């Protein structure tokens, strides 16, 4: 089994408990992002918007497309901000284009530079 469905209340409780988390935890989240990039690349995903739409199915966020190169992720749980941001920093670290990721209150902005 590759995925688990987690109730939003559990998701919030998990991140409330984790708090800042250890460096090891965040390094692992980053590396999981890198690994997912390889997996999605092998599946043929190249377009940033399509990738964000695909990951949106996890219910981590609701995607707003601001422009062709700018996206806002409205988080389901604000406590998951660092988790989602760190995952995508790892994920897009393999991208040939520069991607800026900015955390804001209950949302994350992603911009292709």
Feature locations, PLM:
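N-terminal accessory segment detector
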Residues: 1-67
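Arginine residue identity/basic-tract feature
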Residues: 12, 46, 89, 94-97, ...
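Short, hydrophobic/π-rich interface segment
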Residues: 50-104
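Beta-rich nucleic-acid/ligand-interaction surfaces
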Residues: 103-113
């Amino acid at each position: 089994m590759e995925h688990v469905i987690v109730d939003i209340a559990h998701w919030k409780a998990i991140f409330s408990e984790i708090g800042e988390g250890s460096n090891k935890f965040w390094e692992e989240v980053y590396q999981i992002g890198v690994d997912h990039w390889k997996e999605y690349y092998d599946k043929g995903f190249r377009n940033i918007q399509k990738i964000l739409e695909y990951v949106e199915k996890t219910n981590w966020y609701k995607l707003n497309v601001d422009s062709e190169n700018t996206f806002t992720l409205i988080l389901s749980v604000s406590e998951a901000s660092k988790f989602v941001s760190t995952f995508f920093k790892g994920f897009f670290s393999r991208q040939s284009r520069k991607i800026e990721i900015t955390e804001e209150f209950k949302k994350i902005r992603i911009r292709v530079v």
